[in-house]
Swiss-Prot record:
SUPFAM superfamilies: PLP-dependent transferases (SSF53383). This is LL-diaminopimelate aminotransferase. Belongs to the class-I pyridoxal-phosphate-dependent aminotransferase family. LL-diaminopimelate aminotransferase subfamily. It comes from the Bacteria. It comes from Natranaerobius thermophilus (strain ATCC BAA-1301 / DSM 18059 / JW/NM-WN-LF). The modification N6-(pyridoxal phosphate)lysine is found at K238.
Amino acid sequence: MQSAHRLNNLPPYLFADLDKMVQKEQAKGKEIIKLGIGDPGMKPPEGIIKAATQEMYKGENHGYPAYDGIDKLKHAIKEYYQSRFGVELNPDREILTLIGSKEGIANISQAILNPGDINFIPDPSYPVYKNGTILAGGTPHSMPLKQDNGFIPELESIPQSRLSKGKIVFMNYPNNPTSAVASKDFYSHAVKFCQKNKLLLCNDAAYSEIAFDDYQPQSLLSVPGAKEVAIEFNSLSKTFNMTGWRVGFVVGNEKAISALAKYKTNVDSGVFTPLQLAATHALENRHEYIPDILKAYKERRDLVIEFLEEAGFHVYHPKATFYVWAQVPGNQDSFNFTKSLLTKTGVVVTPGIGFGKHGEGYFRIALTVTKDRLKTAMEKICEYFS
């Protein structure tokens, strides 16, 4: 049996090659420290686990869930956006729960694109923006993110011939992999740009609560007029260490929300109700849980920056996310650098090229192991480059 032709259009998955190399080194008995995947190394707070467990014992919670999300969770999301960002949302028309934000980001292209339509994709970026576009029959157009511009796309550089066929502009701030952040002025500019060119603006805000040094990421939807053209994806995965639970949501433009909801109704059955209720608890009690999580990430961030800069690396100082983005030393390409680092030290980092061609020359460290484990990894890296 042959697979669908559209799967052949997907770019090579570089991370699969990296996984094979890791397995090869592990087979040799080498100790491996994995700093490559953005999967928090901490479990969810006990209160969230307890909330989920209690709800699982209730028989009424084991049937099919509401397709668009239970009312309690949607009202918790409404309250969160109002109190955190000053954004008012209609829970019936402007909020949709997701099986993790990843599926929503992938499926928005299925709901919006026609064959040959163009989506504008930041480069480097989370691969699902591009891959979701391809799987929906669309064409991805790269928007370079350059360090000298703060890893912010230059929207005016997009050719008019491409804009006329465009449907979606994807953004992701705070940013993975670069850890860059966007100003409210940029958000305002992006909204006006999409209004002018009749484009849907999609911001992936999965890291909006992972921020340091008194920095407070803003919501795209806090810009006046944003809901006319924009939606924002969010997730409980990173904020509450719930990556395996698969609970996320999207808010904003009601026409885009409606289209995505219609598509999802035909391909999935929503999020398990006890997990939605646990997510409700997490949002309602976020002030109790988030500070300890941020404290751990800040300590790890500071440790990594100190070690890398002492070893001579050029490091982008993150205000947000749990990543550190640094330049590859010397003349090596990013994949061979990470391969060499793995074989010589046992430390796994992510090559920038895995996020797009404009990620070449960089590598990403995920702050997702304990501080002691991270210190060991940094000592190994610094010893190798001394």
